Amino acid sequence: MSCKRSYHRHCALVYYMVLLDLTNAVFEFSHPLIRDSGNSQSRQLLHHRLKRSWVWNQFFVLEEYTGTEPLYVGKLHSDMDKGEGSITYILSGDGAGTMFTIDETTGDIHAIQRLDREERSQYTLKAQALDRRTTRPMEPESEFIVKIQDINDNEPKFLDGPYTASVPEMSPVGTSIIQVSATDADDPTYGSSARVVYSILQGQPYFSVDSKTGIIRTALTNMDRESRDYYEVIIQAKDMGGQLGGLAGTTTVNVTLSDVNDNPPRFPQKHYQMSVLESLLINSTVGRVLAMDLDEGVNAEMKYNIIDGDEFEVFDIVTDPSNQVGVITVKKPLDFETKKSYTLKIEGSNAHLEIRFLNLGPFRDTTSVHITVEDVDEPPVFGSSFYFVEVSENVDIGTTIQIVSAKDPDATNNSVRYSIDRSSDPGRYFYVDVTTGALMTARPLDREEVSWHNITILAMEMNNPAQIGGVPVTIKVLDVNDNAPTFTKFSETLMCENAKADQLIQTVSAVDQDDPQEGQHISYSLAPDAANNPNFTLRDNQDNTAWILTRRPGFKQSEQSTFYLPLLISDNGNPRLSSTGTLTIQVCSCDKDGDIMSCNAEPYTLPISLSRGALIAILTCIFVLLVLVLLILSMRRHRKQPYTIDEEDNVHENIVRYDDEGGGEEDTEAFDIAALWNPREAHMGKTRQDMKPEIESLSRYVTQTCRMDNNVHSYMLAKLYEADTDVCAPPFDSLQTYMFEGEGSVAHSLSSLQSLSTDSEQSYDYLSDWGPRFKKLAEMYGTKDNNGSL
């Protein structure tokens, strides 16, 4: 194939070269040379812009020339050129010097580079003839065009390939699927190099392609997606009108058959067997059925219906959208004792139908489902789902207010026993007879305390105590008139001396805890013993309130400052209840505006010249002076006193223990009381004497005195910790040398080691002479005779 293509390419090249030579010959023949005669007339005509006589026109050159020699394009010649070599030809413009060159003497133009028409179809150049000796232009500069002749060197290309398309299955023949398009970079205006025709290389006999437009169509009927849903079609585009020697390109078209609803649903089973407990809850799943459909997507969507066997509408069936399964659920409670089995006829059909495929139907199918109800031991069931009881609050204890009844729904019909859920009756107001179900009161009821009771009565099977049923019972306690009305606010009432007759001085009100059906109404009146009270009267407002009014004017605080008015209130219940109360009325002195000034029998009055504002100012000044005095006393009390050591102040009454053995009578070193002020300084720098016996001096240790017990406790713990953690502490008694020990003491040293280190006889008889305080010590260190006598 490549050899044939090369052969045709060379033939076309030779043909175009011959055509080019003929064209140039015609151009040279049609433009005769005009030779310069050399006379003045010729020069004068030359200076008067004579018609230029360039022998040239547009040139043509073939693209893709691959020869070893430069490609001859054409020849430029001026009629002023006498062939003596006096004229120089110069070339400029597009590609001059790089793509094209010119012979300066002959004017021959050659192409020195391979030309590609698809990159550039023509070049515009400029030519000029110069006098070789003077370089003066012999002719004005002129333009000429070099056109690149096209050859068929580009195959068609599918720029948008590969393609993906879809077509519904079962489409009629000739259904358009997709249009493909190929482009050829060759010159469409010259020859047939760019004339493309389409053909199908792979995909017959299912598809066809239009040779001119590239439209792909179906070529077979009844293409079934369920049999094959994918096709790979290869399309060829060939130039030169599809003739032999043309170049070709291919592309791939992936065609997918989309689904249509052309398959009816079918149940793989014609009979299903299911079982379910009668205790299954409503909306619970009984089982699943599935009608298979070879279609997909919306064409496979199913809807299910129960068309027979469920006259009581106990079951329901819905479609699971995730897998198109029919889910059978319980719509009403099941009862083994009522019906033990069901046989349902279920239909499955497509949700979406296509009219043009109805002849392939029917698009529905049926199956039967047999459901067996299994018996379950059920708890007792009450005759009513709830009970509502009304009872008066004055009912006697043990009164039956309701009888409940429950029975075992199973075939065994076991006997039941009744009880009350005590969590619903924490006050234990009621109890129920275990056998009869009679609900009775167990303690007095009080509507004002609890007006509603919500209890739960339980029924339990005797043979199976785990089976317990319950029913709610709501008890409303009805009111009886057992509470007398009481005053809501009953306090002392103040009135002015200058009160007028029939003046309102107090509004009284009362409440009643009872709740009569006809509404609450409280009546007010004066007590019978005060019905003819000359000072005050009562007016019932008929709205559960009453006004206390003055009957006369002229009250005097000095004559009588306090009045007591007994009141009577009663309700409208049956029986009618009443209560009494006494209103205390205090007579006060008031100013002209009615503001109370004093309610005492002998009120304190200010001088006429002293106003209330002046009194407030005086009291404020007194208060400020008191604050200043207290502040000064407080500052003087907390003022820091100078640090002085007084003989009386140094008496702390503390017992000071020394850790040094006494110097006896010779211990005349003065005791520094300052150590008591800071006992820690005396202890700082203390070293262990048993670890360094050669120490020259021993610091005197003063015990720390603490005011609080917790400080003493902390100090003791610190010393104990120091002793416990000291790994160098000797577990033995060692001889210590103290510089404070006196030589002239009568008692000398009490060191046990020093005593044992001497050979002298040790006698402690002198301890008895020291008095009663050393009696115990004398007994411990007595003579041998004494020890023997003990």
Swiss-Prot record:
Give residue ranges on the Cytoplasmic side: 634-790
Q: Which GO terms describe its molecular function?
A: beta-catenin binding; cadherin binding; calcium ion binding
What's the domain of life for this entry? Eukaryota
Give the subcellular location.
Cell membrane
On the Extracellular side, which residues? 26-612
Give the intrachain disulfide bonds: none
Residues forming the Cadherin domain are 54-158, 159-267, 268-382, 383-487, 487-605
Q: What is its main location?
A: membrane
What is the protein's name according to its record?
Cadherin-20
Q: State the UniProt keywords alphabetically.
A: Calcium, Cell adhesion, Cell membrane, Cleavage on pair of basic residues, Glycoprotein, Membrane, Metal-binding, Repeat, Signal, Transmembrane, Transmembrane helix
Looking up PANTHER family in the UniProt record yields: CADHERIN-20, CADHERIN-23
Q: Which residues form the signal peptide?
A: 1-25
Instruction: Let me know which tissues express this protein, per UniProt.
Output: Detected in embryonic posterior neural plate, embryonic neural tube, sulcus limitans and embryonic kidney.
Record's bilayer topology term: Single-pass type I membrane protein
Organism annotation: Xenopus laevis
Task: Answer yes or no on keyword Glycoprotein.
Answer: yes
Proregion residues excised on maturation = 26-52
Task: Give the record's GO CC terms.
Answer: adherens junction; catenin complex
Residues that carry a glycan: 254, 283, 413, 454, 535
